[in-house]
Amino acid sequence: MIRYFLLVAIIIFLTFIFPIEGIPAVEKTSDSNSVSGEILCLPNTANFSTHDCANLGPSAYISRMSDLGISFPFRVENGTQPDQSLTYVDFRYGEVTRENAKVYASLEDAIKNGEVVRRVDSPYSFISYYDEAVVDGKRYYMVDYGGWMTANDISRIGTPSLFQGRAFTHTPEHSFGWIAFPTETKRSPGFGIDDYTGRELYHYQEVQIYSTTEVDGIEWYMIGPDEWIPEKKEWQRIIGRVIPSKTPPEGVDNGRWIEVNLKDQTIAVYDQGQLVFATLIASGIEPFWTRPGLFQIYQKLDSTPMRGAFEADRSDAYYLEDVPWTMYYDKARALHGAYWHNGFGVPRSHGCVNMSVGDARWLYDWAGEGDWVYVWDPSGETPTDPEVYGDGGA
């Protein structure tokens, strides 16, 4: 059996070296897109001379995919996932579920409904707790290094989002991104043809982008061989895209900058012109946009409380304890971890740039005070008039 396969291999090899007499080579016609003849190039021979065969069929398809950067078997290789230990945070968190919730002076006061030292009065409030106790079947949480709250007023938060972006040792050749809203891929761009593949892309799945085209005003991304997704469906953005660029924004003088892309809801981090990290974010939602411009980090805090209100009746007031890995760069606007939601890739903040805890920790460890933050919106939809912006918030 081995001799048989060896013989076949030798015959195929000799066929390419010495074309069989009687079978003519392909003759090109005046039309460069058409040929006459009987021999097609075999797949994976596109890198060799094709003067004796027609680069059509499977060979042409593989050549076209190769030009886009797609090889067979198809592989996705793009950076590395940062250390998962970065997702760990020292605090345990809870959402305050009762209006004007009481904070008691001691555990005994909480048990007996005794002395109240303050109330949590913001409609949207999250606390961090350091200890807990169960007395007579009822649970209590220690907050503020001594104050206590009852479990009736708090809904504990489990593990914050474990989503992490990608770290790089060199700048990728292609753009890439993460799925912000689950979607099914199509065999061709555009909604006019019902050619869905049946393959669902899940939330936060990473994809490569090999080609783009616009159909009916919507940009479509080729993420694999004959596999396309739209940038958005109606108002819902499908993917957060990163387009690597080695050129620093005007004004960056130290080769280090953090690019915040408001259209795609992504961050790209550059060191000496090389992409070193990228991930999804959640920036400010209308009318609390994250302000475009070039800024510098002016303060770093391992954790800090944040509070604010923009409506006169304080109906939108928020209170957030121990916001991790915070870096202020534009008044009250900061880059920081967000433990209270898992909605990265979609605007939802009061102006700050929200990241997962793990991504915020990576960026916090990399960046220093004075490093540049470049915020921009390629779509031009975010206002640039300074009069539109206040101090911002979480």
Residue ranges and their predicted role:
Residues 7-17:
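Bacterial N-terminal signal peptides
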Residues 19-27:
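Boundary at the C-terminal end of the N-terminal hydrophobic targeting segment
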Residues 25, 251-253, 277-280, 285, ...:
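Exported/periplasmic cell-wall-interacting domains
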Residues 98-107, 118-119, 166-210:
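Short, solvent-exposed interaction modules
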